[in-house]
């Protein structure tokens, strides 16, 4: 029988706010796509993510042949202003997360407030350093803004 030393429970909170020159509907649709088919690493590698966009729906990485990774469940969804996910996300260790995307219209722009809170036996490199969760979410929020603004411009401001 193996016994290990006590591990430290850590928590973190990532908060990102972004003003996006696109309608709230376009931004919400873009978030759903970014979490699903357009989810990729900064080097452009697809993560093959699937999002079932309804209460209780799964968010998971589909590697085919009944293989993959469960990331979370849709805890709340109120199109086009709220998407909330709970689950372990990318963490393959004892941890739980809550992720919120909240959208509000402000003066012709959409304000995206993104929050990721987590707690568990989280290694310090997840919280700090080059490959931290903060850097990963910064990339994703930036991609949402770029894609939503590109869609808004391509649609001629419709929606």
Give residue spans per PLM region.
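Hydrophobic-ligand binding "helix-grip"
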Residues: 49-50, 64-109, 117-120, 146
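Conserved strand-loop elements at the edges of beta-sheets that form or border functional pockets
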Residues: 20-22, 53, 76
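Short beta-edge strand/loop motif at the mouth of beta-sheet-based domains
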Residues: 15, 33-70, 80-82, 155-159
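A structural signal for short, well-ordered beta-strand segments
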Residues: 16-18, 101, 114-116
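Generic anion/oxyanion-binding catalytic loop in active/binding sites
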Residues: 15-17, 48, 122, 126
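Hydrophobic pocket/interface hotspot
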Residues: 27-31, 59, 74, 85, ...
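Hydrophobic ligand-binding cavity/cleft-lining segments
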Residues: 1-46
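A conserved amphipathic terminal alpha-helix motif
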Residues: 118-159
């Amino acid at each position: 029988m193996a016994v290990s030393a006590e591990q430290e429970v850590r928590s973190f909170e990532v908060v990102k706010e972004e003003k996006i020159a696109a309608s709230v509907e376009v931004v919400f649709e873009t978030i759903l796509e970014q979490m699903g088919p357009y989810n990729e690493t900064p080097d452009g590698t697809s993560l093959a993510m699937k999002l079932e966009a309804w209460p209780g729906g799964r968010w998971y990485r589909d590697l085919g042949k009944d293989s993959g990774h469960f990331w979370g469940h849709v805890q709340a969804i109120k199109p086009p202003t709220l998407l909330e996910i709970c689950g372990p996300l990318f963490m393959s260790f004892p941890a739980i997360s809550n992720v919120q995307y909240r959208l509000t219209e402000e003066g012709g722009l959409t304000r995206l407030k993104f929050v990721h809170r987590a707690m568990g036996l989280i290694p310090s490199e997840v919280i700090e350093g080059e490959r931290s969760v903060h850097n990963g979410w910064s990339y994703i929020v930036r991609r949402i803004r770029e894609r939503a603004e590109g869609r808004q411009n391509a649609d001629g401001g419709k929606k």
